[in-house]
């Protein structure tokens, strides 16, 4: 096996007199200018910059960010703007941005498209959900952070086909990267003798390479990754994940400098939180009534230097580490816990509010899936922390404090979302509390602790936090198994993207790959429906179905939520109906009911009416979502869409139901755009240029591949789109919103019709209204008032009927009739048959129980039905009685001890079953 030792033998290290050494504590190899025993990273060493800043000057976040970016601009790097934290807005394989390299995966890193600049520098906001349980405890972890970075994208000069990559040659590599790092430290005034470069090979996403962790005074301030290998079962290098890797044609400098930690290093505060958001920490402490004495301040500062040991990813037992830290500081562990726990919660609240500001500010809407689930999880955990530590400020106010710092313009929407979510959480807790008590009873009976799997399910289904489960379970004497990384476990469970797509497959895929790309004529003239082409290949699918490939086509294949065109392919001898059109790679396949013949010249005719309706609905989809964003807010984004000939639907991410007034406003705005008869234009710009001009709202309908992307512009709305569209908005005619419904939490479906389909939908509604008016014998405009009057009368008569039923039940209960009274111990049971519906049976049973008697009633109205009701204080289980009775009529039933119902199909056995009732009652009572 070959390792990466040689990869770290840098000329720069040799020139600067670095020594390669092994840490006596953890065994890692590292480089430093002076001889030392350990690598300097916790737990091998403590933080050595608390009250001892590592740089010449104290910097704020803003100042540190500018210092970094300016440093690299001075070294010929181009500064680019940061991307959103919601990575699924430009890629479909991840949810959140966790590193600056996410901005360039997979298209740039694979060489498919060029980077926006090369080399470049950026300060990228990131969110790492896996760090959530460490936040507040270690003093250094933040779930939301900015990764300052510089990147260089290189391609080897000896590759066979350099034109297949979007960049070429070497910009710079390892020596220059380490030198830049050293120079940055020097410019900040760091003591270069204290800097340690730890060898730590990197693996991720099928790629790998040597990497270096940069440690200064106990803090990891940077990671320098040299992505240069790809997974290969026959590869030369075996990496720490157990897989083998080989060099790849491209090699990339991927660095990460934590903005928050650099700022912390410059200030030397006890934790990173005081350095990053001092005003909010001060506000939270004051609001929660936390005031520290001088001695308590001393303890906090001393403990902070050792807090790096509290990393749940490294420590085997967090509480044992706390015991050790308390002993070293010289206090009892309980005193340490009582002092630090509220502070840790305060730190977590500040961090989580910043995370929420990033999430909601970038348009993530809380829901039960994907990024929405993660936002909801953070919000609910934060609310629990706020309540637990005694902060009485509303959560929306706390999140807004961070949103203001981050300069988001949609702060009103952010606050509205938080308020809505807090109210939903309250309702969820009311429902979920009952489930926790039930679960506690179950495990109390088993004599087992409530396991982690149940905790995760409680959190997913009801939003119940582990500490609430512990509190309720303790009342029942039941332990709870809460792992230290509980929230990371939950987040990982929902870490996959919620927009997975299925790739089309065909049994002759290999043969399709040999065919040339189909020329797509429908992009040249979307209104044209006739064309001529040559048949390149015909595949026999079955006896009467053929898949035909042409050199060019006007038929649009299914894609982007738009169904395929239909029509005919004709020769002098054959007229084949085109029933389906699909795209496989660059080849378009037409499914036909006849074989036009390979090599034949064909005339294509697209169904013009169908094409026109689909174009109207597709362009209308763009207009409707643009209108929805104008009315509901910029957070609104497409979650799915489907176009048809009679109607279309678009699913949007929104945090509450859409009122009728809002629907009408969306509809009015959409029709204004249509009446303005705006030109619908298409262009094919470079991807980077398009993203720079319009941002990632381009990708409402999905993320296209390729260096150039097709943009459709309708007024102020610009989207990347591959569908067919009308030439001007006036060609749509009109749009009518037909329905709105919540299809899942955080997703609203808008169904609408356009063009003639809108007229037809309106006519159907008018027909229904006219028919209702005829039935009610009133004018159409009087239908709502008349329907409301009839409904009120119907409800009133229903109440009268119920009252009469109750009176009849009371009369029967007191008057005897066919009912039989039997003794059951000290109680009396009334047994009888009443051929009535279940409502009346229940009413009479209630009347009998109110008199202090057991009720056993049967009905033969619909099969055989029973109701058994038992008054308080009588030791008879109604569920057991019903079970016995129902068994005699071929059915089943049950319920709680005081009331049960059931039945079966054998109505002929009803009377015999009731005859057995007295004996059943006595047996159950004596059991």
From Swiss-Prot:
InterPro entries: aa-tRNA-synth_II/BPL/LPL (IPR045864), Ala-tRNA-lgiase_IIc (IPR002318), Ala-tRNA-ligase_IIc_anticod-bd (IPR018162), Ala-tRNA-synth_IIc_core (IPR018165), Ala-tRNA-synth_IIc_N (IPR018164), Ala-tRNA_lgiase_arc (IPR022429), Ala-tRNA_ligase (IPR050058), DHHA1_dom (IPR003156). The gene is alaS. Residues 888-912 are annotated as: Disordered. One of its GO terms (biological process) is alanyl-tRNA aminoacylation. Zn(2+) binds at residues 618, 622, 721, 725. This is Alanine--tRNA ligase. Its cofactor is Zn(2+). Binds 1 zinc ion per subunit. The lineage of its organism: Archaea, Methanobacteriati, Methanobacteriota, Stenosarchaea group, Halobacteria. NCBIfam families: A-tRNA_syn_arch, alaS. It comes from Haloarcula marismortui (strain ATCC 43049 / DSM 3752 / JCM 8966 / VKM B-1809). It comes from the Archaea. GO terms for cellular component: cytoplasm. Its EC number is 6.1.1.7. It is an enzyme of class 6 (ligase).
